Amino acid sequence: MTQKRLFGTDGIRGTANTAPMTAEIALRVGQAAGLLFTRGDHRHRVIIGKDTRLSGYMIEPALTAGFIGAGMDVTLVGPLPTPAIAMLTRSLRADLGVMISASHNPYEDNGIKLFGPDGEKLSDATEMEIERLLHADLSGQLAAPAALGRAARLEDAAGRYIESAKSTFPKSQRLDGLKIVLDCANGAAYRVAPTVLWELGATVIPLGVSPDGFNINSGCGSTAPDYLCAQVVKHGADLGIALDGDADRLLVSDERGHLVDGDQIIALIARSWSASGRLRGDGVVATVMSNLGLERFLKANGLILDRTRVGDRYVAEQMRATGRNIGGEQSGHVILSDYATTGDGLIAALQILSVLVEEGRPASETCRVFAPLPQKLKNVRYHRDNPLLHPRVKQAIADAESGLNGHGRLLIRRSGTEPLIRVMAEAEDETTVIRIVDELCDIIAVSAESETQVHLS
């Protein structure tokens, strides 16, 4: 196998009870990953967590059966943030960690994310090997009856993560006097995130903390930030924090109800850590989606912006390769490798709050670190073939790049997690940005529709 079929940029993802997100495939994933990670003579263990989707009740036991059949003991921790699973995998010296989540997607979708014993997302090569085993005949490799694994629940898993998150906040600081609106997206952090802020002294106004299996990311969380911004203004809060369904990313609202994206958060933390001597390396790592304003701000402060392809796993890989300890995405994935191996929305929020406490200024001043260039991102859904291969689309892209004449950026790519074409343009002139994105999206949409009609005819 020369390329991955099941694994995208963030694990395996799809519509629940439809391939590849079926109980049968989840069972095979458990068997394949279990066989790959049962090396050595010690008892082997996998940590399995999930978010609050209804389909988690289907995927969790299927994975559990697969791992047990491969001879691995399974530790079930229930609904917890993705970064908590990475942390527990390291802390409990497990061989593997698994998070059942489709992150910011609606409840109909689900996914499987895998972490190695170091708490890092698996490499492309390892994922390819799991896919190879998944399609192989494993009947002669599974555990003998006496070597089957066992399953048990870790009752204090939430408490362990709560204490781990709190330990990243300066012991000399408290959140007394701060009113914070916290939107947990009816997702994995609905219990732990409010507890952390409350125990540190904040007055917490919790939103999205009543999951029912269907309402994850539904009109709430980081995918619906307007709700957060409105609630911040309504309650006269000092700050608003919105997490996504698995709490590995965040967006923030200042006290005026203005949104603060991942680029501003990265700049804020980088400025603070650079001033205190905590910033490692000569800059930060972000993706090609990050605003040129962030790059200019860092350059003005003697730092560089090291760009990677889209996906927090690629940001993390580049951080490890370069020794940098801050990285992230405009979408709100913020990786602080001093504390976590993956994006952690709650830990990033605590760093923002630490700066607010230290500076004593309102969030509208503290969190507006640089002036972003006009930028527009728009998605076009497609159903079958890649519309970017259509000659008319290729010509339109070439014309748009020529029109920018080196005074802006154009980025067009397929999503690694959904059947979407993402179109982003950035330039000094907002009117130009809007026109280019809208025109390209119209052409891509027409091409995608024509391809569908060809296949249906």
From Swiss-Prot:
Family annotation (Gene3D superfamilies): Alpha-D-Glucose-1,6-Bisphosphate, subunit A, domain 3, Alpha-D-phosphohexomutase, C-terminal domain
The answer to whether the entry has keyword Signal is no
Matching entries from NCBIfam families are given as: glmM, PRK10887.1
What are the alphabetically sorted keywords of the record?
A: Isomerase, Magnesium, Metal-binding, Phosphoprotein
Q: Which reaction does it catalyse?
A: alpha-D-glucosamine 1-phosphate = D-glucosamine 6-phosphate
Gene Ontology cellular component annotations, sorted alphabetically: cytosol
Q: Which CDD domains match?
A: GlmM (cd05802)
UniProt cross-references to InterPro entries, sorted A to Z = A-D-PHexomutase_a/b/a-I (IPR005844), A-D-PHexomutase_a/b/a-I/II/III (IPR016055), A-D-PHexomutase_a/b/a-II (IPR005845), A-D-PHexomutase_a/b/a-III (IPR005846), A-D-PHexomutase_C (IPR005843), A-D-PHexomutase_C_sf (IPR036900), A-D-PHexomutase_CS (IPR016066), Alpha-D-phosphohexomutase_SF (IPR005841)
Q: At what positions is Phosphoserine found? A: 103
Q: How is the cofactor bound?
A: Binds 1 Mg(2+) ion per subunit.
Organism the protein comes from? Granulibacter bethesdensis (strain ATCC BAA-1260 / CGDNIH1)
MF term (GO), any: phosphomannomutase activity
What is this protein's name?
Phosphoglucosamine mutase
Reported EC number(s) for this entry are: 5.4.2.10
